[in-house]
Amino acid sequence: DGMETVKARQDYFKSLGGAMKALSGVAKNYDAEAAKAEAAKLEAILATDIKPLFAPGTSDADFPGESEAKASIWENMEDFGAKGQAMHEAGMELIAAANTGEASAFGPALKKLGGTCKACHDDYRAEH
């Protein structure tokens, strides 16, 4: 069912957003153990295969007011996939930075991950 897919996708991105918020909190008042713990949560989220969450027929055109995924995702799947891959790679870099215990590596890696979120949202997330 398309609406179930929309809800599952939203739940996934809410969990990712929650992780970003927690990681940002760690960056503001750096604590190596907290960074490692939050990075482990991020790693679990990033292990999810999100391809099924972007099934055709689940865009904002299909579910107005519910879905925030622009129909252009399915028209530009190669670019969308590349943006998703960039997010995943930046996330893994952040996890590696957190595991070093070095605050100096953590902040830039978090900023890079946030940039990948914005890049995709700017092109493919509908405003409601």
UniProtKB/Swiss-Prot annotation:
- One of the GO BP terms on file: electron transport chain
Q: Which organism is it from?
A: Rhodopseudomonas sp
Listed name of the protein: Cytochrome c'
Q: Which of UniProt's keywords are assigned here?
A: Electron transport, Heme, Iron, Metal-binding, Transport
**One GO CC annotation:** periplasmic space
Q: InterPro entries under this entry?
A: Cyt_c/b562, Cyt_c_II, Cyt_c_prime, Cyt_c_prime_subgr
Q: Name one GO molecular function term.
A: iron ion binding
State the post-translational modifications. Answer: Binds 1 heme c group covalently per subunit.
Q: What does this protein do, in the record's words?
A: Cytochrome c' is the most widely occurring bacterial c-type cytochrome. Cytochromes c' are high-spin proteins and the heme has no sixth ligand. Their exact function is not known.
The residues the record assigns to binding heme c are R9, K14, S67, E68, C117, C120, H121
One of its Pfam families is Cytochrom_C_2
